[in-house]
UniProtKB/Swiss-Prot annotation:
It comes from Lactobacillus gasseri (strain ATCC 33323 / DSM 20243 / BCRC 14619 / CIP 102991 / JCM 1131 / KCTC 3163 / NCIMB 11718 / NCTC 13722 / AM63). Keywords: Ribonucleoprotein, Ribosomal protein, RNA-binding, rRNA-binding. GO terms for biological process: translation. CDD domains: Ribosomal_L18_L5e. Part of the 50S ribosomal subunit; part of the 5S rRNA/L5/L18/L25 subcomplex. Contacts the 5S and 23S rRNAs. InterPro entries: Ribosomal_uL18_bac-type, Ribosomal_uL18_bac/euk. This is one of the proteins that bind and probably mediate the attachment of the 5S RNA into the large ribosomal subunit, where it forms part of the central protuberance. This is Large ribosomal subunit protein uL18. One of its GO terms (molecular function) is structural constituent of ribosome. It comes from the Bacteria. It holds the Pfam family Ribosomal_L18p. Belongs to the universal ribosomal protein uL18 family.
Length: 119
């Protein structure tokens, strides 16, 4: 019997393929996105040193739990861009972690761009 492909396995395969090609530095960190059913998380990572420079998620107290998931994702993107601006980070490499550039991932990216991050 032909089995249906596991979406998360395929996403992880795409993520590994993408991660082999992109890497973040202190000057241009990697903006990594993780999307769960309930929340969305984003962080700026310096892969050379192996440290997280900034992060934001829907679990943060300053991000409203009201509104749709798309609106919450946009708030996360805005909060991350503001945190990056305080740390003088203007340019990033976008890592969508194997997710399609659509919906919440796109909303987060667009909000980050509108608030000053370049990618």
């Amino acid at each position: 019997m032909i089995s249906k492909p596991d979406k998360n396995k395929l996403r992880l395969k795409r993520h590994k393929r993408i991660r082999g090609k992109i890497s973040g530095t202190a000057e241009r960190p990697r903006l990594s996105v993780f999307r769960s059913n309930k929340n969305i998380y984003a962080q700026l990572i310096d892969d050379v040193e192996g440290v997280t420079l900034a992060s934001a998620s829907t679990n943060d107290k300053n991000i409203s739990a009201e509104g749709s998931k798309m609106e919450q994702a946009a708030e996360v993107g805005k909060a991350l861009a503001e945190t990056a601006a305080k740390k003088n980070i203007k340019s990033v490499v976008f890592d969508r972690s194997g997710y399609l550039y659509h919906g919440r991932v796109q909303a987060l990216a667009d909000a980050a761009r509108e608030n000053g991050l370049e990618f």
